[in-house]
From Swiss-Prot:
Cysteine pairings via disulfide bonds: 101-188
Entry keywords, A to Z: Cell membrane, Disulfide bond, G-protein coupled receptor, Glycoprotein, Membrane, Pheromone response, Receptor, Transducer, Transmembrane, Transmembrane helix
Full protein name: Vomeronasal type-1 receptor 100
Residues annotated as glycosylated: 175
Transmembrane segments: 33-53, 71-91, 105-127, 150-170, 210-230, 255-275, 286-306
One MF annotation (Gene Ontology) recorded for this entry: pheromone receptor activity
Tissue localization of expression: Expressed in 1-4% of neurons of the vomeronasal organ. Only one pheromone receptor gene may be expressed in a particular neuron. Not expressed in the main olfactory epithelium.
Coiled coil spans: none
């Protein structure tokens, strides 16, 4: 089996499983994993429908509404792809051909990259929304959703290109005369590319991740500075005994700051787990941990966004009251 570098182009949970692998027989891990995915699918579906109805009713949209709706759609599709892939991880049916393997793994990897991109874009747009009029970012406040859509489409094409190597390296029927492959699911295998191609795609992935996460951290720090400055100004004008009430923009910024922090922490944790899997290739514990970690952000993020929407909060409260009265 070949070892992959840290920023490797491996598609999902590539693991050195063999024919006697018992990953799919652990019912507790399987049930917990599908519960996590099921909760994430329901939450993202609810958030996506909320933004669709909001658009249909013609309500005034914020600069960040489109990325939030898009992020819920991306996470929904990513979780659906992950559910199909998980079925072939935990249930040994080996019924997929090359086309299904390439299609599912390629789409999953593309959606995961788009999740990172959209999260970064959301952080930058919120920093633009919060920026003062004297800032150089203020001129971007009045950009229409059309500009955001064009940026998203351009980045989508870029990410599909970066993940295109999977269309070659993913196969359903490996060459069993060689050990130079890694099993992704019970049906799908990844055959390593040449050293040159592997190095090129690893470099592209590393540049992508480092650039976007760095931009996310910079925009997050910028928002923290603006919030602290605004709070100090309010306290200076009203006195330290009064607690300034946060504006809707500030509450939204605090929510996105919390989400960005959670995303960065999960990314760091995922990187640590990936490193441990690289050093201890046959350790199933790291494999199980990465299965759960990779979907935590997609499952938790819709709840964070819904907690800031008064209409959703009031609707859920009324539903809870109705359930109690039944």
């Amino acid at each position: 089996m070949s070892e992959f570098p840290f920023f490797s182009p491996q598609p999902l949970f590539s693991y050195m499983m063999n024919k006697n692998s018992r990953v799919h027989t652990d019912s507790n891990i399987r049930n917990t994993f599908f519960t996590e995915i099921g909760i994430g699918i329901l939450a993202n579906s609810f958030l996506l429908l909320f933004h669709i109805f909001k658009f249909i009713r013609g309500q005034r949209s914020r600069l960040t509404d489109l990325p939030i709706g898009l992020l819920s759609l991306i996470h929904l599709l990513m979780l659906l792809m992950g559910a199909f892939i998980a079925i072939d991880i935990f249930i040994s049916w080996r019924g997929w051909d090359d086309i299904i393997c390439k299609f599912l793994v390629y789409l999953y990897r593309s959606f995961r990259g788009l999740s990172l991109c959209t999260t970064c874009m959301l952080s930058v747009l919120q920093a633009i929304t919060l920026s003062p009029r004297s800032s150089c970012l203020a001129k971007f406040k009045h950009k229409s959703p059309h500009h955001v859509s064009c940026a998203i489409i351009s980045l989508s094409i870029l990410y599909m290109f970066i993940s295109s190597h999977l269309l070659v390296s993913i196969n359903a029927t490996p060459n069993l005369t060689t050990n130079n492959f890694m099993q992704v699911t019970q049906s799908c295998y990844i055959i390593p590319l040449s050293y040159l191609m592997q190095s090129m795609f690893s470099t592209l992935l590393a540049i992508r991740d480092i650039s976007l996460i760095s931009l996310m951290v910079l925009s997050t720090c910028y928002m923290v500075v603006l919030l602290c400055r605004h709070r100090n100004q309010i306290q200076h004008l009203q006195g330290t005994n009064l607690s300034p009430k946060a504006s809707p923009e500030q509450r939204a910024t605090q929510t996105i700051l919390m989400l960005m922090t959670f995303f960065v922490l999960m990314s760091i944790f995922d990187s640590i787990v990936s490193c441990s899997r690289t050093m201890y290739l046959n350790d199933p514990t790291s494999y199980y941990i990465q299965i759960f970690v990779v979907y935590i952000y997609a499952t938790v993020s819709p709840f964070v966004f819904m907690s800031t929407e008064k209409h959703i909060v009031n609707f859920l409260k009324s539903m809870c009251v109705r359930v109690k009265n039944v």
